[in-house]
Amino acid sequence: MSREALAKKIFCIGVDGMDPRLTRKYVDEGKMPNVKKLIERGACRHDLAMVGAMPTVTPPMWTTLATGAYPGTHGITCFYRATEEPDVIAYNFDSRNCKAEPLWNVFAESGKKTLVWH
């Protein structure tokens, strides 16, 4: 694939709990050659850190990445949420609870091909 064709594609890899400092260390030591190739051919922060949202727990962080919106906008702020029933909580990591549009839907609506694999 040509460099120009690659420039028109987005490939995002996210690994929950992957320490960017250790990843950078192992890449620099040659222990992660395939990750090094992806870094060299793409665009990323040098320190590999994700500029995220608060709180720094899984549901709001992944939803922020998926939507480009902060937790106050997309509504996913923790693992659980209150329900209408007293003393009942529900798992909150569910797209039906998200108030913002995922980026892949935005891209698809503008005629772009998208693929999401979880």
Description of each model-found segment:
Residues 14:
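Generic enzyme active-site microenvironment
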